């Protein structure tokens, strides 16, 4: 069964070809390199679970689209934008997430008989990691045909 590898490879390829991303990693979110040695902006793929049905396997995944927050020492007088680039990161990384999901819906993943089920859920984060990262956790389910037989 190679559908798992094909799914994560297609996600990696879709993310890697887009601007506003320098690196794609995979695994548990705790495995993300938070020592400022990674090349940000960064996307990280995690697998939440899989459901096996009669004819398909449903892969529930989250892709984290993130960048380092750059704090400006100038005093913030508006109290709206803040003295960092958090809003810029949320804007660019949501645009990246939207583009990647659309590519997966219409691109090679779709032509390889995979499909995203339903809509992707996007959750912003601004204080999830110790390295002042901000971005989006995008969760979605990809259905793949099972190529396993019981014979």
Language-model-detected regions and their locations in the chain:
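Short, hydrophobic/π-rich interface segment
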Residues: 88-114
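Short, charged interaction patches at domain edges and termini
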Residues: 1-13, 53-58, 106-151
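Short beta-strand segments enriched in hydrophobic/aromatic residues
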Residues: 49, 67, 142-144
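Small/polar-rich, solvent-exposed N-terminal microdomains that initiate assembly or binding
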Residues: 1-56, 103
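Short histidine-centered catalytic/ligand-binding loop motif
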Residues: 75-93
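Short acidic, glycine/tyrosine-flanked loop/strand segments centered on an H-E-D-like triad
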Residues: 62-81
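Residues in well-ordered beta-strands of folded domains
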Residues: 46, 64, 139-141
């Amino acid at each position: 069964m190679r559908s798992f590898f094909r799914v994560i490879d297609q996600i990696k390829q879709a993310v890697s070809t887009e601007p506003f991303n320098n690196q794609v990693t995979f695994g548990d979110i705790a495995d993300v390199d938070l020592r400022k040695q990674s090349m940000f902006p960064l996307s990280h793929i995690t697998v939440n679970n899989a459901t096996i049905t009669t004819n398909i396997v449903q892969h529930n995944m989250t892709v984290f689209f993130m960048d380092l927050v750059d704090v400006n020492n100038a005093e913030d007088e508006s109290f709206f934008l803040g003295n960092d680039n958090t809003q810029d990161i949320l804007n660019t990384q949501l645009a990246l997430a939207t583009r990647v999901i659309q590519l997966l819906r219409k691109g090679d993943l779709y032509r390889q008989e995979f499909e995203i089920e339903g809509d992707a859920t996007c959750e912003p984060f601004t204080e999830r990691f110790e390295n002042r990262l901000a971005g989006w956790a995008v969760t979605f389910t990809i259905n793949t045909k099972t190529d396993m037989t019981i014979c």
